[in-house]
Amino acid sequence: MELTYNQFEILTIIEREKSKLSQRNLADLSGLSLGTVNKTVSELLNENLINEDNMITDKGLKSLEPYRVKRAIFLAAGFGSRMVPITLNTPKPLVLVKGKRIIETLLDAVVRAEIPEIIIVTGYLGEQFEVLQKKYPNIKIIENKLYNEANNISSAFLIRDKLQNSYVLESDLVLYNPNLIRKYEYESNFLGKYVKVTDDWCFETKNGIITKQKVGGYDCFQMYGISYYDAKDGKQLDNDIKAVYNAPGGKEKYWDQIPLDVCKQNYRISVRECKENDIIEIDTFNELKKIDPIYDV
């Protein structure tokens, strides 16, 4: 059966938590109103997707399978010039923040969500990423030999046929809330935090759907580089990435400009909202020093 968005949200929380939850618990965890949760729980009970104890049934698990995330793809090829001097000898995703590599905060969440396939696209000092295979033996590493000649669309070009039911993650994000990486996703989406003003990459939305990507804005969502593409959009991206990459000026594009700007008419991407302390993007060496005082010497 096809689930409504609210049914999906409640069912995935119940599956993830694997413990008896009250409707108040479900409201707090989902951000839905108590009235909406009450109505949704009744629907799930009537369909035998949960039992009287608010635990998921076999039928409930089966109903989630079409929404299962198949893989997580990490874009990790760039130099990270604004993080010099630390990136002169270490790729930015492998920089330690409070004793843990930046990319490992993401990888641990992917493993926790039981996502079966993990791909890392490397470039600058790519051989150093092999150290991750000791802790994460199922990682597949793909080398982008053109990382220094083109923007990150060159990394997306290499994995364009693997984007169906897949997360795409920038590898320089420090993740504090692992629940942002989920076993199931309802629809194609991009992570964002609501802000009153920003000078960073952001997007405008209408009824929860991204309508415009831009740099700087008011009353908008600041972008974070974690997105998900369902089967339909993943297949479309395969075609669009190839077309844009091979067009004049295409190699200068950021890869996410394809679904959010250049070819946005082909997609319906929703914003998945995160909170202030869920995730941090470290752009500069000064920002790194503020987060981890060990570098402030």
Residue spans of the language-model regions?
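Key DNA-contact positions within bacterial/archaeal DNA-binding proteins
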Residues: 35
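N-terminal glycine-rich phosphate-binding loop and ensuing alpha1 helix
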Residues: 11-14, 63-126
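A short, conserved structural fragment
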Residues: 45-54
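Conserved core of the sugar-phosphate nucleotidyltransferase
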Residues: 9, 177-249
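Conserved beta-loop-beta/alpha segment of the NTase-like Rossmann-fold superfamily
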Residues: 130-201
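Short amphipathic alpha-helical interface segments
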Residues: 2-32
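Conserved alpha/beta core of the MobA/IspD/sugar-nucleotide pyrophosphorylase nucleotidyltransferase superfamily
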Residues: 15, 55, 61-72, 223-297
